[in-house]
Swiss-Prot record:
Name of the protein: Nucleoid-associated protein Plut_1285
SUBUNIT field: Homodimer.
InterPro entries documented for this protein: YbaB-like_sf, YbaB/EbfC
Family indicated by similarity: Belongs to the YbaB/EbfC family.
MF annotations from Gene Ontology: DNA binding
Entry GO CC: bacterial nucleoid; cytosol
A Pfam family this chain is assigned to: YbaB_DNA_bd
Job description of the protein: Binds to DNA and alters its conformation. May be involved in regulation of gene expression, nucleoid organization and DNA protection.
Subcellular compartments: Cytoplasm, Nucleoid
Keyword annotations from UniProtKB, A to Z: Cytoplasm, DNA-binding
Length: 109
């Protein structure tokens, strides 16, 4: 077997970098949500796991502990959905060239 062509390898690395940038842009546009307490708390996040909105039913505002618990549950639900959505999008766009976990680890950068 012959040695790999260095030029081809560099081209593949460049293509992977371009795809990663495209994926990052796509993830910002993807939106999902989570809720808790039967819809008393709703959170919307994007594919980069940034919270875009938080809604709390005014009727539950008197119970601070319940509000805290529901906010945490809704945020975690939305982030889990966002993570699944991001992995699907990365896999779809990258076509096996990029490991979804590599991008997800660097979302905050």
């Amino acid at each position: 077997m012959g040695m790999p062509n260095f030029g081809d390898m560099m081209k593949q690395i460049q293509q992977a970098g371009e795809k990663m940038q495209d994926v990052q842009k796509q993830l910002e546009k993807l939106v999902t949500s989570g809720e808790a307490g039967g819809g008393m708390v709703k959170v919307t996040v994007n594919g980069k796991q940034r919270v875009l909105s938080l809604w709390i039913d005014p009727e539950i505002m008197d119970d601070a502990e319940m509000v805290q618990d529901l906010v945490l549950a809704a945020v975690n639900s939305a982030l889990e959905a966002s993570g699944r959505m991001a992995q699907e999008e990365i896999s779809k766009v990258a076509g096996g060239m990029i490991n979804p976990q590599d991008i997800l680890k660097n979302l905050g950068q």
